């Protein structure tokens, strides 16, 4: 985070209004994405982003976020404080305009802010519109100002309620339960985002507190190392190829800046995150394209120049040179152009050349100054290249075999007769025994079954060539029909529901995790598109007289037993606890786990790539201490049958 401050005043005259606030309550999803959990947490980010923009402008050093006892949120900063003077055009204070007019803010003209993630005031007004109550307090001019709102409308004028030392803004809001499905905030979700913001803005101190349930906890996120510390944090459960993090920060006269931190590990997967003005550009864009192009060219040029790659050797591909790379690419610029309203892909064309040039110069300099580390990096890239070539040959062999064999689907697959993928689903079933029951009990029109023998390969510890030689993985790839890795084509997917059906025990959970690791690492669009599900088979079957009940957890079973004993008197109760799917006959399996009307399916989703990468690295990687720590910390959330 640069130390330079934006010149120019920040008062009500700089607040410009684009349109009124009425549409927000009618169509909240257009402004915050959804009225579910992600939208609820988005409210916090909108207010925090305004404070971060004060930090980017050089005026804010501390931000405090508190989840209050009643699940309201307070965000406080030590920035300049929102403008309290009257705007002549609207005869309202700057504070009230910011909170009651949509698209009102001080970021259009460039005087109040040079670089910002959003439009100052868009966030505040949207949050106000979607809150049943909001209180704003401002420290400015030696006075403490206060104003209260409800559902986007001011309930009191802006008034001075006392004296104040210093400057800053404080916002407390209560999300409207009439709009949101649930108004309970998740500490871990906020923790992840605020830690990320602190990494991206070195020196900024962000505090997160939780005052609920009498359990007053507080965490401080403050990283003087910025992106370098971010990369070390992401790699803390991996083994780095070189101890130091490669880092550079380059600026241009027009306020465009790129900062990059990168480090290679012994992992087989890439984790490169990109940001534009602190916004996580999940789909990348011109900054990420420039970075990737430069890394590929620099590694190839260095390898050729130093005879590590022979003239006759093919060039290393982008995938080869990024295997095991953890990187952060963060750009800051005026008026960024995004390719969608949700700002997940940067479209500003001139950024590509700037990032590519900066990366080429600085990464080349690092390799030339660190020949030992350079050789280790290029050795890893060349191993990746050899594995990729072996995997390509394995895929070609499979393709040729499939082209010659009209019955190329796996022999174990019991396919469905429906040919519309949107109406079709496939069950991946643990073991031949349960697979047999599933084949008998299924709806043959729409449900396919593929039994899996034992535990599939742990892809976290294997390269592509070994993965593609695994029989169980080859069977899945062939059955799905959409290819894998670079050949993946979602339009060719044969089933729009891929359902993992494993035993409700430790082994079943392990197999489920192995499958999810494979899908996340090598068929990512399946998970991102919401095509992957986990079936939830029952844990208990309870009989009382002629009545049969199935329950799916111990608390549910306890409730059922209490109810039966209350209503059924002395009538005998028989309980069977299922250890595996194979203990159910095909009628029971259909009735409890496969029947469209009765079953419970859990849709697997990935909200955050770095968090998912971390969990799979911990659970399926080589390091035991972080895995043990993760299991101990999360055991209370798990349902485990030992």
Residue ranges and their predicted role:
Residues 88, 339-352, 550-556, 560:
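Helical (often loop-to-helix) elements that flank the catalytic cores of nucleotide-handling enzymes
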Residues 82-104:
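Short conserved segment of the HATPase_c
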Residues 53-54, 81-82, 506-507:
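Residues immediately C-terminal
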Residues 26-45:
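Conserved short strand/loop->alpha-helix "switch" segment adjacent to the catalytic nucleotide/phosphoryl-transfer site
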Residues 386-405, 420-425, 436, 440-442, ...:
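C-terminal interaction appendages of subunits in large macromolecular complexes
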Residues 1-14, 21, 43-45, 53-55, ...:
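GHKL-family ATPase ATP-binding module
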């Amino acid at each position: 985070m640069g130390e330079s401050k934006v010149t120019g005043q920040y008062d009500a005259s700089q607040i410009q209004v684009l349109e009124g606030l009425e549409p927000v309550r009618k169509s909240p999803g257009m402004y915050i994405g959804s009225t579910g959990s992600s939208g609820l947490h988005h409210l916090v980010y909108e207010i925090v982003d305004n404070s971060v923009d004060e930090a980017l402008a050089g005026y804010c050093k501390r931000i405090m976020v508190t989840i209050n006892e009643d699940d309201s949120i307070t965000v406080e900063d030590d920035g300049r404080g929102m403008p309290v003077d009257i705007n002549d055009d609207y005869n309202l204070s700057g504070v009230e305009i910011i909170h009651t007019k949509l698209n009102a803010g001080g970021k259009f003209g460039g005087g109040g802010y040079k670089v910002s993630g959003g439009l100052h005031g868009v966030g505040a007004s949207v949050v106000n519109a979607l809150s049943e109550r909001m209180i704003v307090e401002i420290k400015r001019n030696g006075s403490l100002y206060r104003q209260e709102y409800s559902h986007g409308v001011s309930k009191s004028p802006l008034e001075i309620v006392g004296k104040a030392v210093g400057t800053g803004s404080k916002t407390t809001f209560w999300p409207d339960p009439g709009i949101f499905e649930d108004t309970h905030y998740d500490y871990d979700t906020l923790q992840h985002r605020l830690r990320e913001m602190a990494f991206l803005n070195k020196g900024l101190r962000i505090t997160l507190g939780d005052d609920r349930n009498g359990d007053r906890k507080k965490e401080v996120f403050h990283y003087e190392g910025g992106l370098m510390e971010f990369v070390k944090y992401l790699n803390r459960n991996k083994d780095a190829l070189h101890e130091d993090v490669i880092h550079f920060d380059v600026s241009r006269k027009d306020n465009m800046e790129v900062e990059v931190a990168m480090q290679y590990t012994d992992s087989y997967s890439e984790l490169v995150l990109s940001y534009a003005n602190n916004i996580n550009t999940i789909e990348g864009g011109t900054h990420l394209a420039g970075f990737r192009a430069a890394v590929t060219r620099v590694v190839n040029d260095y390898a050729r120049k130093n005879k590590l790659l022979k003239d006759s050797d093919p060039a290393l591909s982008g995938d080869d040179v990024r295997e095991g790379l953890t990187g952060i690419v963060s750009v800051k610029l005026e008026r960024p152009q995004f390719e969608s309203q949700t700002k997940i892909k940067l479209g500003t064309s001139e950024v590509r050349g700037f990032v590519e040039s900066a990366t080429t110069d600085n990464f080349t300099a690092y390799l030339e100054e660190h020949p030992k580390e350079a050789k280790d990096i290029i050795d890893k890239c060349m191993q990746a290249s050899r594995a990729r070539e072996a995997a390509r040959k394995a895929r070609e062999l499979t393709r040729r075999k499939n082209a010659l064999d009209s019955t190329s689907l796996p022999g174990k697959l019991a396919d469905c007769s429906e040919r519309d993928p949107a109406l079709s689903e496939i069950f991946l079933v643990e073991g031949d025994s349960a697979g047999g029951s599933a084949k008998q009990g299924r709806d043959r029109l729409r449900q396919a079954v593929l039994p899996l023998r034992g535990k599939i390969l742990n892809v976290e510890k294997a390269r592509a060539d070994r993965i593609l030689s695994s029989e169980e993985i080859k069977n899945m790839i062939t059955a799905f029909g959409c290819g894998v890795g670079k050949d993946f084509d979602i339009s060719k997917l044969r089933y729009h529901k891929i359902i993992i059906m494993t035993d409700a025990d430790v082994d079943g959970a392990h197999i489920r995790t192995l499958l999810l690791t494979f899908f996340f690492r090598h068929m990512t669009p399946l998970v991102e598109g919401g095509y992957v599900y986990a079936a939830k088979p029952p844990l208990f079957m309870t009989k009382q007289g002629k009545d049969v009940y199935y329950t799916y957890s111990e608390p549910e079973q306890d409730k059922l037993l209490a109810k039966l004993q209350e209503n059924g008197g002395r009538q005998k109760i028989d309980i069977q606890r299922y250890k595996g799917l194979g203990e159910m006959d095909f009628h029971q399996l259909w009735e409890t786990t496969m029947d469209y009307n009765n079953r419970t399916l859990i849709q697997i989703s990935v909200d955050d790539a770095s968090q998912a990468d971390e969990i799979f690295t911990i659970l399926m990687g080589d390091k035991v201490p972080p895995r043990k720590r993760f299991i101990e910390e999360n055991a209370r959330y798990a349902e485990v049958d030992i």
